[in-house]
């Protein structure tokens, strides 16, 4: 996906390709995009709600990097993994129109990288997630949780499972962000597992999910339940 960035009066705008960007990310009116600047040519992306405090990772559905073209600024690559200790920007989405005024950015200084807004320290791995039985916690998983976890509300946790033949079974309609044609049903079992069914085969094939893959789902509710996913 190609977009063009333009800088006017100290603010950055997506001046071309905004409509495609919104469709690809599943961005909704009132939500925010946080860009963490890694280098002059690379940035990471996080999605926030209207209050800026429900922090939701934005993962490109293709699992590939999104490249952008420059316009009065250097070209950038949008990565699918946020990383701390870098400068950041925030884009507020107010409509679906493909105009630069819809994508104005501002500095982000109210979201710390190693503590929450109340000044509490970074949460431990055990405090950040539940791991299903028989799920091996690899260094990659721990690293992922340590990076993403800082953007969770303190009441939120990850639930990590290893995909198996009985995991995908449920009853609430969900959509993959950026892929409205892929819908599934979500169901919560008596032992608190969340399972998916109907449409799962198509979704798994699209995202290269196989038996024994470890997947991290990010569920959020725009008004409809949507998900983004990482496959480790």
From Swiss-Prot:
An example Gene Ontology molecular-function term: DNA binding
Cross-referenced InterPro entries: B3_DNA-bd (IPR003340), DNA-bd_pseudobarrel_sf (IPR015300), Plant_B3_domain (IPR050655)
Location of this chain's protein in the cell: Nucleus
Bias kind Basic and acidic residues: ranges: 95-107
Main location: nucleus
Key words of the record: DNA-binding, Nucleus, Repeat, Transcription, Transcription regulation
Composition bias type Polar residues, residue spans: 108-121
DNA-binding region in chain numbering: 1-51, 140-232
PANTHER family: B3 DOMAIN-CONTAINING, B3 DOMAIN-CONTAINING PROTEIN REM23
Gene Ontology cellular component terms for the protein in this record: nucleus
Protein name: Putative B3 domain-containing protein Os11g0242900
Highest taxon of the lineage: Eukaryota
Annotated segments matching region Disordered: 92-121
